Amino acid sequence: MKYLIVLYAYVLNPLLNLIPIAWIDIFYDNMTHVGNAMHHPYYLIAWATSTAVGLFVSSLLIWRKYKISYSLGLHFLLCSGWILSCCIPYSVDLPGWINDAHVWIAIACTIGFSLEWLILYTKKESFIYSEIKTLLYVLQFVFLICFGTLASAGHVNALCEMLYSISVNGVLAAFVLRFVL
């Protein structure tokens, strides 16, 4: 199990995230551009699936180990929302509501996932274990950096998406490897 987590978090997911560097300007374009305008929809879905599965599984492993209450249905909905968002095409030729659905599902799921972790600050069971407290501080810092990347560009770009996918998955995987397994 440890081998699979290392392979996923530190090889497969980063490689999937770094591929667009050869295709687009990661400071301007986003992953949707790769999937729709550049006609690589299977890459886009693979990227979203990789990100979502890693975040879903790592979170569950941590929450179960430390007996932190969570909503499995909500967590599944938030993580699978990224995949759903990437399956909805984005194009100027499509009705605006389709493009809006693509964008707002992705935004809602990203914010929702981040809030799932940040809300743990309000739960007393989160502070029983010092390692969970440390994880929350590290995740808060990572979320802040990701938001800073978004704010500095003024829009969602591939760098922001790649940074969130690699860093949050990496932090959660490192925690799972060190404290859970």
Task: For the regions a language model picked out, list residue spans one by one.
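Juxtamembrane "helix-exit" motif on the non-cytosolic side of transmembrane helices
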Residues: 61-62, 87-95, 122-123, 146-156
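Membrane-proximal helix-loop-helix units in multi-pass membrane proteins
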Residues: 78-135
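Non-cytosolic membrane-interface motifs at loop->transmembrane helix junctions
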Residues: 36, 94-107, 157-166
